[in-house]
Amino acid sequence: MKRCLLSLALLLSLTACHPQAVRSHVAVDGAVGGAVPMVGVPVTATDHAGRRVVSVVTDTQGRFSFVLDGVGPFVLTAPSGDDDGAPATLSAVFSPAAGQASAVVNLDPVTTLQTQRALGAVLDGAPDTVQMAGLDAARIANADKDVAGVLAPLYAAFHVPADAANDSAGGTSSHADAGNPWTALFSVVHFDMRHGTVGVGSDADRAVVSVPAQGVPSAAVPARAAASALALAQGATTTPIQHVIVVIGENQTFDGLFGGYVPAAGQSVKNLLSEGIIKADGTPGPNFALAAQSKGTPSQAYTLQPERAGSYATLPQPLQIGEMDPVTFENAVGTPDARFPGNLPNGPFQITRYVPYRDAGKDGLAATVVTGDPVHRFFQMWQQTGGDNARLDMFTWVAANTGMGGDTKGVSPANPAQGGELMGFMNMSAGDAPLFRSLAQHYALSDNYHQSIMGGTGANFFAIATADAPFFNKDGQLAVPPANQIENPDPMPGTPNFYTRDGYSGGSYVDCSDPKQPGVAAIRAFLDARHIPSKCAPGAYYLVNNYNPGYDMDGRPEPIGPDNYTYPPQTVPTIAEALAKRGVSWKWYTGGRDTADVAAEASAWHVSVAKAQMLQYNNIGDPLVASSKVMGDPTLKSGLAGLATLDSDLAHHTLPAVSFVVPKGFDSGHPGYSAPASYEAFLKDLLAKVQADPALWAHTAILITTDEGGGHFDTGYIQTVDFFGDGPRIAMLAASPYARKGVVDHAYGDHASILKFIERNWRLQPLSPRSRDNLPDPVTKVGHPYRPINGPAVDDLMSLFQF
């Protein structure tokens, strides 16, 4: 029999003509989702008596198929995320006709409103026996009429066919399709299924209509709101956001900045304070032992779970590692930092109990109060967290016994040059990080956003631009790097945990497709136990730690060889290419790239402009410099700019649609030579410049984050996505007139989420078949908001906004 697409009205007529006692045997397929497909979620069918008769999981397109065998009407349900990111249930009613062999039934926001109205209840999972007992043809017909009446102007504006206006089956897709009115409608209309409301249109033309599960529906969608929604669907963006500015500081975990944050009433946050690890004054709390650090025992091979050997009595003395002298610009090595006591309690400590947040009596660079720079490298971070950060207790021992690797200047088995500095945090409850606190109160904050790659800056900036990882190659073809540059994290004999080959002037590549390679087997076993693909191409040596890119900022190739800690030019697809192909303007602004960025500082510091650029320009934070496609195309290359260009673009109203902004090194917040107060000062200035242009600010989203956590302690759950990460939590703030004020969002995200936001807003495809922006949006259970049930999954950040 030919497969048929049944409208709800037709199903109702069939139900009326054929008693519910008729047993059905129907092959059903369909799709689950709205603006995006719901991937990896269970679809459950419940029969007229409240029995769950079948359940299957959606595929990578959000589609499903099963055979329904029983007596209808049936209610199909699937877990989903609501418009604000909270857990919700998608649903649809299906009443098969006698003898019907097949049907297409979709679960989307419209079918959900219809089902909730028919049942008189908002579902949390499959309906129960009592709810199903009240479901009959009359209630279904009335629900159909109510929803159609409220949404009729929207259907008319989007030219939804009359025979489909009561059933949006076939309309789910992850990307807009002009040939599918349902896809276009779902891409710009915002459904709050739990509350039965629908937000239509934008700005002055926006209207919110209501189709509650019980009670009187609102009036129909106003014509102006429907027209506004259609204009969005036909316009350049799917939201009112016309400019996205992504600001990327450095090396702070979520707990490192927001460990003492108290959210607004009605909001919750997972941090040091809420977990009872600290008190509001920064001293140890009743659950301080949750963060107690353990010692490990030596092993012959790299392991994610070193055997524990008891706890530290006190933290190791914090060290001065990486602390820069503001006059000589020399960095300290692993010597004790006398500002901190040598007997700190074994757990997190408030940094500003011992040093000021900012030196108020000084100006410029001298006002920055620096602290030691914790190790933040790939294999160390995997070992510190155990992959998922379930135990929290190995941060200190791994750092203190491994350091930044023996291929790093000043680091040796006798002195790994790491102490207890990684356990320090800023305390907002005591007045620290006032701008970050204010931004969280006035805009939206995520407490479940993560660095993409275990380890440091280079790999994470590359992930921000590509949702992927760089690899060693020769003329674009896979090749083997010099032997001295291949990682070996197996401990040296006679040391507690000092890696055999690791460091910024040495081991940084790994062939993770080969379990026989040092360090690979432990991580692959962790992945295999959780059925997570490694994403390691056969024979590819991936760069997992910091090397310089293959070009200088002007596009001149850098030498590649055993004594050159530079990775070859990359062909990995970038967001720059995708935006350019779509005709969306973009720039990547990196502090220090323009000579004008550092001219005043060069004069003040009595150094050359070239020296000032060397100090301030973060070449590994300018990841598009690594791309042969970007650097080989004059048009693409022209999108790489400095902060003087950013200031000019803001002043002349020529800011591109998508901007990535990287502060100068001393403003980045990176421990050792910067601090959170310096990053705040940079953000304050940037926000003021954007908000000084009301027309720009009105339709702008500023996404504020860091590249990675810098090796600092954090309590957040880590979802393993592939061999490369994710890594620990970092902050993500969304500042915009459209941000949900004071909201703490729990949807799971990483740096691919930035790309997913851009792609959804400007209707772009994922960057490549293997890039992480292909991952589905996360779905969670009520009461468990941090762990996706359909992982690996990462958010698109849309739940930080209310459009």
Segments from the language model and where they lie:
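Positively charged n-region of N-terminal signal peptides that target proteins for export
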Residues: 1-4
